[in-house]
Amino acid sequence: LLRGAGGVQGLRADGGGVGVDHTDGVEALQPRATITQYLPIFVAKQAREQLMTVAQAEGRVAKQVPEILFVCVHNAGRSQMAAAYTRTLSGGAVEVRSAGSAPADTINPAVREAMLEEGIDLSAETPKILTTEAVEASDVVITMGCGDACPIFPGKRYEDWELADPADQGIEAVRPIRDEIKRRVSALISELLEPES
């Protein structure tokens, strides 16, 4: 942690020969944070995730399981639900990331509520910006309404899932989107983890 007169100023993390300075992460989140006491924890989590992403994209860390990246515009609804279902339904057999081409400040409250109905808590999640490294480190990239925002790398599997956008929608409108995402994620996991014959 980098501390200054105003408290925590940033985080410097090193791993696998890769360094990331997240001073900008704290500065970006601080004005929006309602509970600043936990801000260093959120920034540290994002730094760890970014370090692993960069290390895998550069081939410094071997992948143990298939990796999926879910991308939507705001990373506040569809991609968050898809990532959460992937974590839950795969039981750790798949590594998952989510990102947005223009991330929102927070997760959509109706999405958070709809996922709680499924026993999945998104309160610790935050919208993240789409990076080239995240795409490069992934085996499968699923986009949802973000057009051509994703860079294309050879050898990656790309799919675009046409789903309604839950932004500014109530829980009643979010539930069918959630259920369709769950169905698609279940099918994707089964396909990825199916033993080769």
Outline where the language-model segments fall:
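Basic, alpha-helical nucleic-acid-binding regions used in initiation and control of genome expression
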Residues: 1-18, 24, 34-39, 53-63
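Amphipathic alpha-helical segments that form the core helices of the histone-fold
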Residues: 17-32, 44-48
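Conserved active-site segments centered on acidic
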Residues: 53-132
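Short glycine-rich anion-binding loops that position phosphate/pyrophosphate groups of nucleotides
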Residues: 76, 146-149
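An anion/phosphate-binding loop that grips the pyrophosphate of nucleotide cofactors and donors
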Residues: 138
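Phosphate-binding/catalytic loops
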Residues: 150-197
